[in-house]
Amino acid sequence: MTSIESHPEQYWAAAGRPGPVPLALGPVHPGGPTLIDLLMALFGLSTNADLGGANADIEGDDTDRRAHAADAARKFSANEANAAEQMQGVGAQGMAQMASGIGGALSGALGGVMGPLTQLPQQAMQAGQGAMQPLMSAMQQAQGADGLAAVDGARLLDSIGGEPGLGSGAGGGDVGGGGAGGTTPTGYLGPPPVPTSSPPTTPAGAPTKSATMPPPGGASPASAHMGAAGMPMVPPGAMGARGEGSGQEKPVEKRLTAPAVPNGQPVKGRLTVPPSAPTTKPTDGKPVVRRRILLPEHKDFGRIAPDEKTDAGE
């Protein structure tokens, strides 16, 4: 990069210098009677004839040079002052931009550090919600299973309430047994409710309904069989079911084994292609016979015994 150097003092000095001296008139021959004298006089006059224009041009050039020197001195001085002011402004702007850049960098660094810290509570809440979802689903499943068991028990009680003969048995129990009339044997309630996690199965020892039939005489079975103890007779099936209904039995797990698929195991190895056997193709027609043809010159000149035998064999 080239630098521009200016010297305003020298420019002002050049502008203040005196002007050039005008050209003086040259000597003119006085002339004479001869032709040579006349020619010399004409030459002197022609030389001095253009001195006025030459002096005017020299003075104009000097004036223009002085004006340019003064203009350069003024412009360079003003340009230097303007450049100094611009440099001061650029320095101030650079400081402001540097300060703004430093502030932006600090804010970006603080944002990068504070961003994860501000997201920690939200992430903790999301983790807590994720941990609570399995517990809530388990509680909902448990509540659903209890509700289904209660509904099944209510349906069984409603179905048993309308059976014939239960009213008389209950009445006899009130008379003979005191407070035993308000209870219902478990044999009449049917099988216990099956958990929802296993397929519904019914034990073979728990009948769904009582097989008790009223006697033909019209008397209630409880009054006919009441003895000294005052307790009603209970069918054997009901007694067996009462002991079994005290606790919920788990259904028997069944395992199904699918038959194995023949040749269903994966096969590992490499497949090697056997080399192809060479095939021979019979040629159609007779085999081609090659014959040797000798020119007459070859037979006459340079013929030897092996050539004779070869020609005879062919």
From Swiss-Prot:
Protein's UniProt keywords contain Membrane: yes
Q: Can you list the GO cellular component terms from the UniProt entry? A: plasma membrane
- List where Low complexity composition bias occurs: 203-212, 219-232
Where does the record place Gly residues bias?
165-184
Q: State the annotated membrane topology for this chain.
A: Multi-pass membrane protein
The membrane spanning regions, by residue number, are 23-43, 98-118, 221-241
Q: What is this protein called?
A: Uncharacterized protein Rv2083
Which organism is this entry from? Mycobacterium tuberculosis (strain ATCC 25618 / H37Rv)
